[in-house]
């Protein structure tokens, strides 16, 4: 019985960091292959093959797509990492409002390293999921009460909705 109990305990931390681990891996891989290509160390043919593979990994089908099976942690993590880089280097007014401490700090790698070292998925999503990524993924929140005949769209793309979507996803 102890072995059966210890196996799930071993994998528990991986479930707490899936978006961050997969997002970090795809972001770093994408960054490295682009730098190598820019330096001429990867041919165009190999680059196209790598980008095709990468695109397949980070693909997020829409909720109405037959392939949809939930949010792809690779896609969400990668999008969030890229968005953090954008916020640090080229913020919008909305970014400055939502992320005053990192917007325009011009240190995306420092910001990402801090996030990787100090957050699990729940706190990472609560801290860094931006309205831009929420819109890109077309995220919304449904309230589905079994006794009710219909589902209610309870959080949409507005200030209150962004915060509620972040909280629900975390």
Question: Over which residues does each language-model region extend?
Answer:
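Short, charged/polar micro-motifs that form catalytic or ligand-binding hotspots
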Residues: 11-22, 66, 70
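Inter-helical turn/loop segments and adjacent helix faces that build the functional surface
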Residues: 11-15, 35-44, 91
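Non-catalytic terminal regions of proteins
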Residues: 45-170
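Sec-exported extracytoplasmic/periplasmic mature domains
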Residues: 9, 30-34, 85
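Active-site-adjacent bridging/hinge elements
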Residues: 1-8
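An active-site-proximal "capping" alpha-helix that borders the catalytic cofactor pocket
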Residues: 20-33
